[in-house]
Amino acid sequence: MPDITRRRAYTTAAAVAATASAAAPTAAPAATAAARHDHTAPDSFDEVYKGRRIQGGPASGGGHHHEHGGGYAVFVDGVQLHVMQNADGTWISVVSHYAPVATPRAAARAAVDELQGAPLLPFPTN
C-alpha cells in the first residue's frame, strides 16, 4: 500500500468538506422559507397617521397586469400609493423603495414619514 502524500490527504479532505457543505444547507433554507411565506392576505386598514389618512385593502380589480401589490391597494389621502411585495414577503413602495417593511400598513406609514407633509402625486402608469 503506497504512503499517503500531503497532496492526496489535502485533496481527500477538500472533497469531503465540499460534499458536506453542499449537502448541509439544503434542508435549512427550505424550512426557513416555508416559515417566512405566509399565504394569508394582509389585513385591511383605515387610519389617520400623522394627520394623513392611510388606507389599504384587497385591490378592486381594474385589470392592471403590471401591478405587483399582490392584489392589495394602498392609498394616502385618497391617492394610490403603488406598493409591491418582495419575494421574501416584505413590502416596498415607490416613495420608500429602498426600505422594505413587514406590512402594507408599514409601507404607507413609511411613505407618510418620507413625504414630510408633501402631497402624494399620482404615479403615471403609461
Swiss-Prot record:
Phylogenetic placement of the source organism: Bacteria, Bacillati, Actinomycetota, Actinomycetes, Kitasatosporales
Family, as annotated: Belongs to the melC1 family.
PTM per Swiss-Prot/TrEMBL: Predicted to be exported by the Tat system. The position of the signal peptide cleavage has not been experimentally proven.
The organism's place on the tree of life at top rank: Bacteria
GO biological process: melanin biosynthetic process
Listed PROSITE patterns: TAT
Region (Disordered): 21-71
Function, as annotated: This protein may function to deliver copper to tyrosinase.
Signal sequence range: 1-33
Record key words, sorted: Copper, Melanin biosynthesis, Signal
Biased composition (Low complexity): 21-34
GO molecular function, one term: copper ion binding
Name recorded for this polypeptide: Tyrosinase cofactor
Alphabetized Pfam families for the sequence: MelC1 (PF06236)
